[in-house]
């Protein structure tokens, strides 16, 4: 999307805040339904980021697959869970939460210290040169097909297996 700089920056900050608030909602909200809706907010914000980056096909796929299918499946599964049996065993803070917090905080600090030291200039020009060559030869849908069948074949297959397992799990839960 070709927007003026100020509007583009405002939308980036607004969507970034939506991502942060949605992520915090997923982690901190005690009600699993609210957490699932917060996850939907995160997926929508990611989709809007793709629109800002001029990746309209990826944004549409993000909305259809993650918001339209995965998030609905999560909400469907959460609604089958009886909340009363889990709420009495709920402890506010456990040892695993502390270990996870330490690991995530150390990963965040290492990323924050690494990102400013990285030379992004060469990476950007190399990527742009590759994109120019690819854009001249084939269309966007052909590029996506080529990348899915070559560069991203293994992750694509893993995602399809995960979706198959989720679908089988949803059917098993629905039959009970």
UniProtKB/Swiss-Prot annotation:
It is found in: Plastid, Chloroplast thylakoid membrane. Keywords: Chloroplast, Membrane, NAD, NADP, Plastid, Plastoquinone, Quinone, Thylakoid, Translocase, Transmembrane, Transmembrane helix, Transport. InterPro entries: NAD(P)H-Q_Oxidoreduct_6, NADH_UbQ/plastoQ_OxRdtase_su6, Nuo/plastoQ_OxRdtase_6_NuoJ. Coiled coil: none annotated. It is a multi-pass membrane protein. The chain crosses the membrane at residues 10-30, 33-53, 61-81, 92-112, 152-172. It comes from the Eukaryota. It catalyses: a plastoquinone + NADH + (n+1) H(+)(in) = a plastoquinol + NAD(+) + n H(+)(out); a plastoquinone + NADPH + (n+1) H(+)(in) = a plastoquinol + NADP(+) + n H(+)(out). GO terms for molecular function: NADH dehydrogenase (ubiquinone) activity; quinone binding. Pfam families: Oxidored_q3. GO terms for cellular component: chloroplast thylakoid membrane. Its EC number is 7.1.1.-. NDH shuttles electrons from NAD(P)H:plastoquinone, via FMN and iron-sulfur (Fe-S) centers, to quinones in the photosynthetic chain and possibly in a chloroplast respiratory chain. The immediate electron acceptor for the enzyme in this species is believed to be plastoquinone. Couples the redox reaction to proton translocation, and thus conserves the redox energy in a proton gradient. PANTHER family: NAD(P)H-QUINONE OXIDOREDUCTASE SUBUNIT 6, CHLOROPLASTIC. NDH is composed of at least 16 different subunits, 5 of which are encoded in the nucleus. Belongs to the complex I subunit 6 family. This is NAD(P)H-quinone oxidoreductase subunit 6, chloroplastic.
């Amino acid at each position: 999307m070709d927007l003026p700089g100020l509007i583009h920056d405002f939308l980036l900050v607004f969507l970034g805040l939506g991502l942060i608030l949605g992520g915090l909602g997923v982690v901190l909200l005690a009600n699993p339904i609210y957490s699932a809706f917060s996850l939907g907010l995160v997926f929508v914000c990611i989709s809007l980021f793709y629109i800002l980056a001029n990746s309209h096909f990826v944004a549409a796929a993000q909305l259809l697959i993650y918001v339209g299918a995965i998030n609905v499946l999560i909400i469907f599964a959460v609604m089958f869970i009886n909340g009363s049996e889990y709420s009495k065993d709920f402890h506010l803070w456990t040892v695993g939460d502390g270990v996870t917090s330490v690991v995530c905080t150390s990963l965040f600090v290492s990323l924050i210290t690494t990102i400013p030291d990285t030379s992004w200039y060469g990476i950007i020009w190399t990527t742009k040169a590759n994109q120019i060559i690819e854009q001249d030869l084939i269309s966007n849908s052909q590029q996506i097909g080529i990348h899915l069948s070559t560069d991203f074949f293994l992750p694509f297959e893993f995602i399809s297996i995960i979706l198959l397992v989720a679908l089988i799990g949803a059917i098993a839960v629905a039959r009970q």
